[in-house]
Amino acid sequence: MTRNDKRRIRHKRIVKKIRLTNLNNRVVLIVIKSLKNISVQAWDFSKNVVLTSSSSLQLKLKNGNKENAKLVGMDIATKLIKLNQKDVVFDTGGSKYHGRIAALAEGARAKGLNF
């Protein structure tokens, strides 16, 4: 089993838990990480629609390192606060909560999002 297969299995398990326990219909932040960039989408599963998104490509950042991931987190937080969505559920996309994923979460928390 490859590393990517393991990540997909983890992600299915995470999504299943989120859908079962998200009884308040909070917005879900889904993180997509590639080797060079990082992006995040804010999903509302009750309406099945993406509310807003942000990425290192959209912000025209050179790479997806920790500092830029923190900026992406701050950007998505400001967009969600404008939409009056402060309480969210964080979905790591099957990746471990470490490095760029953790930096993105710290940036979002610094701007006022509650996980």
UniProtKB/Swiss-Prot annotation:
SUPFAM superfamilies: Translational machinery components
Quaternary structure and interacting proteins, as annotated: Part of the 50S ribosomal subunit; part of the 5S rRNA/L5/L18/L25 subcomplex. Contacts the 5S and 23S rRNAs.
InterPro entries xref list: Ribosomal_uL18_bac-type, Ribosomal_uL18_bac/euk
Lineage of producing organism: Bacteria, Bacillati, Mycoplasmatota, Mycoplasmoidales, Mycoplasmoidaceae
Family membership: Belongs to the universal ribosomal protein uL18 family.
GO terms of biological process kind: translation
Domain of life: Bacteria
Function summary: This is one of the proteins that bind and probably mediate the attachment of the 5S RNA into the large ribosomal subunit, where it forms part of the central protuberance.
Keywords: Ribonucleoprotein, Ribosomal protein, RNA-binding, rRNA-binding
Any single Gene Ontology cellular-component annotation: cytosolic large ribosomal subunit
Any Pfam family the entry gives: Ribosomal_L18p
Protein name: Large ribosomal subunit protein uL18
Organism field: Mycoplasma genitalium (strain ATCC 33530 / DSM 19775 / NCTC 10195 / G37) (Mycoplasmoides genitalium)
Sample GO molecular function, one term: structural constituent of ribosome
